[in-house]
A protein has these predicted regions:
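Glyoxalase I/VOC metalloenzyme domain signal
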Residues: 1-4, 8-28, 46-96, 114-126
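Short secondary-structure boundary/capping segments within folded domains
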Residues: 35, 44-47
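Short active-site-proximal "capping" loops at secondary-structure junctions
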Residues: 34-37, 60
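Conserved catalytic-core motifs of GNAT/GCN5-like acyltransferases
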Residues: 28-35, 99-103
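Short acidic/glycine-enriched loop/turn segments that link adjacent beta-strands
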Residues: 36-41, 104-109
Length: 126
């Protein structure tokens, strides 16, 4: 598994981008897109140090925002999504979404899991 990005909850993606720009230099930004499979609006930012932030707004993060939680998930890129899913689930992880294509990542497959340290997303390698 290789670190890919941090998922950030937000009510308004444009406002969150403006807030982030006050602290960090953004060197790359995707358009804000709607992913019907996740029922969320999404935008990927790359910061000057290479860190990727996925901004997520919509129903999927409403419960986190109500609790004033901004961090949503950590994403790892994996060679074999089914193999990693099986490994994590056999070590106390709980699958919380189906494996599905993600529009933001050119339809590479993703799956979300709950582990001891929070929510992780597995992203299939290119």
């Amino acid at each position: 598994m290789k670190f890919h990005h941090i998922g950030i909850c937000c009510k308004n993606i444009e406002k969150k981008i403006n807030s982030i720009e006050k602290i960090h230099k953004i060197i790359e930004k995707t358009e804000i897109i709607y992913d019907p499979l996740q029922d969320a609006n999404l935008c990927m930012l790359t910061l000057e140090d290479g860190t990727n932030l996925e901004l997520v707004s919509g129903k999927v993060v409403e419960i986190f925002l109500k609790k004033k939680i901004d961090y949503y998930h950590i994403c790892y890129e994996v060679a074999n999504i089914e193999e990693e899913l099986e490994n994590i689930c056999s070590n106390s992880g709980v699958q919380i979404s189906e494996i599905k294509p993600a529009i933001l990542f050119n339809n590479r497959r993703v799956v979300f899991l709950k582990v001891d340290y929070g929510i992780i997303e597995l992203l299939e390698e290119k």
